[in-house]
Amino acid sequence: MWSIFEARPKEAHSVNKIGWLRASVLGANDGILSLSGLLVGVVAANADIKVILITGVAGLMSGALSMAVGEYVSVSSQADLEDADLQLERREMDADWDAEVDELAAIYRGRGLDEELSRTVAVQLMEYNALEAHARDELGINIHTTAKPTLAALSSAASFSVGGIFPLLTSLITPLEYLSLVLPIATMFFLGMLGFVGAHIGGAKRVRAILRAVVLGLLAMAATALVGRLLEIHALSLQYAI
């Protein structure tokens, strides 16, 4: 039986991949859908290839920067909140150590330990690392996985760019007269592959992940194509009115 202070052998659980897998899939999915939706809308408005490519490059750059800034702000805010909670916990332990022991013991009693054992565990954990014990069991914070806003921002921008480059390249190599048909089909393929890769890495059901990505992506592109078509009709009506 392992002691609570001994290192356990690591087990390969899929849940351990949730953080980085979610961020990577989310960024790449946003890149594919944002660029595809934007390009489909422009194509539906009968824009020429120059306008389509300029729109695609601008969308890729603005989307990547937006993802980076949003992720940086989000992770920084989370880090600030966690740090404030840890500082408060330090002050509470300095002010009344015994009360913090009782608080930790009460948490363990709520998880099924008896009175004596819960207090023994609380005392030993606080003697070993009081802040870590309270951060983990009271606040739900792992002090060993500190937030890295810059890394998170760069990763988010990179994953968005990787996803967005595929529909942009599709627009580059496809003749304009076929683009309205090829781009949605290619996007469905890209989304399906992304769903498959995410499900494979995470150990989830692949068919469900693929269908979810493809169906939702198709709905998003249909909406943007409709908007583009309506804008073209409106522009033509204004032109004839003038």
From Swiss-Prot:
Q: Which residues lie on this side of the membrane: Vacuolar?
A: 46-48, 174-180, 234-242
Write down which residues bear the modification named Phosphoserine: S3
Q: Looking at the record's lineage, which domain of life comes first?
A: Eukaryota
Entry's Pfam families? Answer: VIT1
Q: Which InterPro entries match?
A: Ccc1_fam
Q: Give a yes or no for keyword Transferase in this entry.
A: no
Give the Cytoplasmic compartment stretches of this protein. 1-24, 70-152, 202-212
Sorted alphabetically, the keyword list is: Endoplasmic reticulum, Golgi apparatus, Membrane, Phosphoprotein, Transmembrane, Transmembrane helix, Transport, Vacuole
Which protein is depicted? Fe(2+)/Mn(2+) transporter pcl1
Specify the species: Schizosaccharomyces pombe (strain 972 / ATCC 24843) (Fission yeast)
